[in-house]
Amino acid sequence: MAEENIVYIGNKPVMNYVLAVVTQMNSGVTEVILKARGRAISRAVDVAEIVRNRFISDVDVKSIDISTEEIVGNEGTSSNVSAIEIRLSK
C-alpha cells in the first residue's frame, strides 16, 4: 500500500479528515488507513463512522489494529502512548 493512502488523525476538526478520506475514495483508491495516537483515537473512530454512515455507505471496516508505542521525552523519560490503525475498504 502506498503512503498516500494513509490519513494521520490529529487535532483538526473531524470533518477535515472525513473530507480527506472521501476525496481519496472518490479518486479511485479502494483502501484508506486511518492512524491515530493518544487522545486522537476517538477522533479516528468518529471519522470512520461518519464516512461509513453519512457519506459512502459501501465502505467497510476491514481491520482495526491497536498497539502501544513507547515515546521518549526530552528529559530521557519514556511514556507509553496508545495507537490505533483503522483500515477502510470499498
Curated annotation (Swiss-Prot):
One of the record's GO cellular component terms: cytoplasm
SUPFAM superfamilies (UniProt xref): AlbA-like
Keyword Secreted attached: no
Any GO BP: chromosome condensation
Cellular compartment(s): Cytoplasm; Chromosome
GO molecular function list: double-stranded DNA binding; RNA binding
InterPro entries hit by this protein: Alba-like_dom_sf (IPR036882), DNA/RNA-bd_Alba (IPR013795), DNA/RNA-bd_Alba-like (IPR002775)
Keyword NAD: no
Keywords: Chromosome, Cytoplasm, DNA condensation, DNA-binding
Protein's job: Binds double-stranded DNA tightly but without sequence specificity. Involved in DNA compaction.
Family: Belongs to the histone-like Alba family.
Protein name: DNA/RNA-binding protein Alba
Native organism taxonomy: Archaea, Methanobacteriati, Methanobacteriota, Methanomada group, Methanobacteria
Underlying gene: albA
